[in-house]
Amino acid sequence: MELNSSSRVDSEFRYTLFPIVYSIIFVLGIIANGYVLWVFARLYPSKKLNEIKIFMVNLTVADLLFLITLPLWIVYYSNQGNWFLPKFLCNLAGCLFFINTYCSVAFLGVITYNRFQAVKYPIKTAQATTRKRGIALSLVIWVAIVAAASYFLVMDSTNVVSNKAGSGNITRCFEHYEKGSKPVLIIHICIVLGFFIVFLLILFCNLVIIHTLLRQPVKQQRNAEVRRRALWMVCTVLAVFVICFVPHHMVQLPWTLAELGMWPSSNHQAINDAHQVTLCLLSTNCVLDPVIYCFLTKKFRKHLSEKLNIMRSSQKCSRVTTDTGTEMAIPINHTPVNPIKN
């Protein structure tokens, strides 16, 4: 469908913002999530993965699925929002964006509930056989979200608009809603309401965890360390939601109403600008999610700490070698230096 470019607003700063932000997220996200999968493959045989580690692996896979589409979006925005790639890639990119967003929300939700149970009912949780439940819950989440996202694979994802100069046409990807479409509005209302229901449940669970941990007396240094890590994990999960997901879902409904022509046009540009910024924030969850793993698994922290210590040691040795070479080079011009014997 061809539309006149003057009939819609555009946030031109996104053609600079998205390529920069997405490039950084792509590099950091691939490294961080790839490393997480590699560590899990090395440290944990598949049959020894407990419930929470199963959720973490699935969360990492969801992040990687989105990360592999980022080069497509980088090309799109670098080309001033003109999709010249095959249409099915636009559908695929939109589908994986949806899958990553709501798989991340779902798996962070079940991870939080797992920790909530461990804090409130430690004996019952320790005695429970949770591996099968973790696999079953993961399958339910994937089936439900992939089924919902499959709509993006079959919908008409592209539309043609006039370019800024009016001298030709460009193809947009997932940037067109039919004016006054009530089905589109209902879908977005359901998505936003569903998200905030999950967010409120996560907020409740995390507040209970914080309250319970702070009330417990700390008698040993080890217990203090465990409590500190647990509190950091809770704060990190909440930070991921507040930074990445909440802003987008607060703006999503007003933006949808504006795109459908159901919102005052005087605010359309400001809402569209805010929407672009929240899309950038939404994608940062792929980089922040791996931080959570540091507080959840002892082996992961130990492995990461060992690698960091090796890197520091190698850098220190390199500096010592350089300094020694400098010190020995100075007296050569004056008097011979006896070789150092070990």
UniProtKB/Swiss-Prot annotation:
Cytoplasmic side: 39-54, 114-133, 206-233, 297-342
Transmembrane segments: 17-38, 55-74, 92-113, 134-155, 185-205, 234-254, 277-296
One Pfam family recorded for the sequence: 7tm_1
Superkingdom, natural source: Eukaryota
Disulfide-linked positions: 90-173
Keyword Ion transport tagged: no
Membrane topology qualifier: Multi-pass membrane protein
Entry's Gene Ontology BP terms: chemotaxis; inflammatory response; inositol trisphosphate biosynthetic process; phospholipase C-activating G protein-coupled receptor signaling pathway
Alphabetized InterPro entries for the sequence: GPCR_Rhodpsn, GPCR_Rhodpsn_7TM, PAF_rcpt
Gene3D superfamilies referenced in this protein's UniProt entry, alphabetically: Rhodopsin 7-helix transmembrane proteins (1.20.1070.10)
Subcellular location: Cell membrane
GO MF annotation terms: G protein-coupled purinergic nucleotide receptor activity; lipopolysaccharide binding; lipopolysaccharide immune receptor activity; phospholipid binding; platelet activating factor receptor activity
Subunit structure: Interacts with ARRB1.
Family under the similarity heading: Belongs to the G-protein coupled receptor 1 family.
Protein name: Platelet-activating factor receptor
Organism classification: Eukaryota, Metazoa, Chordata, Craniata, Vertebrata
